[in-house]
Structure formats: C-alpha cells, structure tokens
Amino acid sequence: MEITSVLLKPLLTEKTTMLKDEAQQVAFMVHTQANKLEIKQAVEKAFDVKVEAVNVVRRAPLNRERQGRVVGRKPGWKKAYVTLRQGDKIEFFEGV
C-alpha cells in the first residue's frame, strides 16, 4: 500500500486532545487495509517524528434504520492511536 494513502485524516476529539497532553498520543483515521507497520512508516515520513507504538481500533459498519426498516449502511473504519517518542510533537495538533 502507498504510504501517502494510509493516513486519511486526523481525529480531533476531547479524548484525543486529552491523550495528546497526557500520553504523547495522536489519533488518525487510517485506510482499512493498513497495518501497524505501514501506519508507523507513514506518520514518521509525513511528520518527521519517531513513533514508539501504534494501537489500532476497528469500527464495525452499522445499519441505518428508519421506522424499523433498514435504509442503508454506514461504512466501517479504522482508527490508529500513535504514541510518539518523548519530546516529539506534530505541529498540526499543537494549536488544539
């Protein structure tokens, strides 16, 4: 998989902001076929930081219902929590 297509977008929520401050972690929405090694390489190349660990969470697809009938589906996606080396920062997340 191309390194440029691994990271889809950063996740900015209350939880990820707290993790950034307390545990030196940032979160990204990543391609569903990406593995931990590809995510690590993509973050290190894109932001010029060292990654210590990558934790991955998959969100299952959900059925959209209206009045008891299935109308459609929300697609599943994959989230990666990336732990950075002590002292490294990603400038994109610093103003949040």
Curated annotation (Swiss-Prot):
It comes from Desulfovibrio desulfuricans (strain ATCC 27774 / DSM 6949 / MB). The keyword RNA-binding applies. GO terms for cellular component: ribonucleoprotein complex; ribosome. HAMAP family: Ribosomal_uL23_B (MF_01369_B). Pfam families: Ribosomal_L23. Coiled coil: none annotated. GO terms for biological process: translation. One of the early assembly proteins it binds 23S rRNA. One of the proteins that surrounds the polypeptide exit tunnel on the outside of the ribosome. Forms the main docking site for trigger factor binding to the ribosome. Part of the 50S ribosomal subunit. Contacts protein L29, and trigger factor when it is bound to the ribosome. The keyword Magnesium does not apply. Keywords: Ribonucleoprotein, Ribosomal protein, RNA-binding, rRNA-binding. Belongs to the universal ribosomal protein uL23 family. Gene3D superfamilies: 3.30.70.330. This is Large ribosomal subunit protein uL23. GO terms for molecular function: rRNA binding; structural constituent of ribosome.
